[in-house]
Design a protein with these regions (language model features):
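Alpha-solenoid helical-repeat scaffold
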Residues: 1-185
Length: 185
């Protein structure tokens, strides 16, 4: 995926690949999580998170959500996911924020919010720092949201705190996306 000049040029291939990876995690997690290239697989999926095409982006996000949250059958291999998140979690979160803010179509926002929630649950002590770094990155297009200011700070606080419900987290992240896209209420 990284060797091609345009990774989005083969959306059907990307969709099928990440759907296969997701099914491996569901039915035979040890097959996938014990591969020596698992970190490269994680990075390839992360790179697709802020793409424009719905199907393969959704497939990559669905794979990453299960990869990070795990299954009972994958418990023996959780260190693979933890290592990948420790190594590349900030980059994954940056792609996710980029997708929420402006890069991805609106029909992917709910999927990206779920990925952001899973990242926050999987790395609760790191997510605040990752968010601050992502929002400070001048290369990150935040659309209508000022890089510094009350709205950006509120998003970092809201997304990094432990939420009692999934709905509360969804509310914080969807409001961030609406503000960035110039659709705030």
């Amino acid at each position: 995926l990284a060797s091609t000049a345009a990774p989005e040029a083969e959306p059907e291939l990307l969709s099928a690949f990440f759907e296969l990876c997701h099914r491996c995690l569901v039915f035979r997690p040890q097959l996938l999580l014990s591969l020596p290239c698992v970190a490269s697989l994680f990075d390839a999926a992360a790179a697709c998170v802020a793409h424009q095409e719905f199907q393969h982006t959704r497939a990559a996000i669905t794979f990453l959500c299960l990869f990070l949250s795990g299954t009972d059958a994958a418990n023996l291999y959780r260190e693979s996911a933890a290592h990948c998140l420790q190594r590349s979690g900030g980059t994954l979160l940056r792609y996710c924020v980029q997708g929420l803010a402006s890069a991805s179509p609106a029909n992917l926002v709910d999927h990206q919010i779920e990925l952001l929630r899973v990242i926050a649950e999987s790395a609760p002590t790191a997510v605040h720092g990752w968010l601050v770094a992502a929002l400070a990155d001048p290369g990150l297009d935040l659309g209508a949201l000022p890089r510094q200011g009350a709205a950006a700070e509120a998003f970092v606080r809201g997304a990094a705190q432990q939420h009692a419900t999934v709905a509360a987290f969804h509310c914080v992240a969807s409001e961030f996306s609406r503000v960035c896209r110039g659709k705030a209420r």
